[in-house]
Amino acid sequence: MKILRKICSVVLCAAVAVFMACSLAEGKEKAGALSAEDFVPADTVAVSDIIEGLTARSAVVTEMTTGRVLFEKEPQEQCECGHYAKLMVLLLTAEKIDSGELSMSDTSVVSEYANSQQGSQIWLDKGEKISVEELIKSVSAGNANDGCAALAEKVAGSADKAVELMNSRAKMLGMNGTVYTDCTGMEEGNVTTANDTALLCSELAKYKNLTPYLTCWLDTVRDGKAELVNLNRLVRTYKGVTGMKAWGSEKAGSCIAATAEKGDMSVCVVLNGCDSQEDMNTEAKKLLNLAFDTYEIYTPELPEDMVKEIVVCGGEELSVELAPEGLYPIVIPRGTYRMVECDFTAEEKLDAPVKNGETAGEIRYTMGGEVILEGKIVACKEVKKMNFICGIKKLVYNLLSM
């Protein structure tokens, strides 16, 4: 508790002063998959103070909806991938289900490759038929290697093709420190980083249909023949947890990727190389609490006097409506939203032709005099330049309206 109080004190005192340097890039759109560029390094926070007492060799704490890195320790250090690889298999599965190419009720015929898997397993027999849903359960809660192999083969057509898709998807997400050599993550050569795992979790967290499986504590598959026990103890000990995966090995130590929601915030904690499972769980809870207690989501509010319409000169219409663009929720130190100020600038007029989305002004949000978010004020639709025929029509209309 002394360590936690010290950490909270340091963070709360420093958060307002240092927050602005971590503001998100200008004009970045909120929609779409988060990439490596979306994660802003926590380089302005005294990391050594924040991570004091952690046994983890590497760690990352992010707010997933904004991509803001809150705390980090050696985030790019490569480590054994292990069961984290199964999160990528789950992501590929979720995307196939979302596109309609796969359903929970579809069945997979267990191959010799899947049957040959060692370690954590649900004891699948060669030629056995098992549903996609049961395979998802076995991978989400049970870390089953045979279940993962069978699921990967169902999704990609073969284990080799699955590895190709896994590496391709990792590249798309900006997981530059990750390499998959097999679909289960158990072979030599599978590597990842804490930062990459946070990127993967942020993408996987979008698929809410998987949450019941990722948060399941105990379950069975194969008509009760195989019992599943989730190594992520936070699914039953931390309120608001939404997944993801815990595992360990002699070489890697105890590792966890845990996600949780509280209010508007969705936080991911990744800890690699903890000294023990007990340390891993304690430190994950500590960092989740620290994130929720220290930060909050701020949704930009528009000033009441913001210009909503602008005159168009020489256009088929006399004016065009305006709207803000490029504004999205951001992370700020908790309790500082009253310090946020907003101002805007706008042109007096636009000359036709006006393009849809044409810039007519700027809007910015500041805290303590520093810009934390910037956007544009743009035209809501196209306005064509007035021609002779249009001019005659308007003249006649105005005469008839007199």
Give residue spans per PLM region:
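Domain-terminus/edge residues, biased toward the C-terminal soluble/receptor-binding domains
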Residues: M175-V179, E187-M402
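A generic local structural motif
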Residues: K2, V45-V47, C255
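Gram-positive cell-envelope targeting signals
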Residues: M1-A33, F388, I392-M402
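Active-site-adjacent loops and short helices of periplasmic peptidoglycan-processing enzymes
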Residues: A25-N195, S202-K208
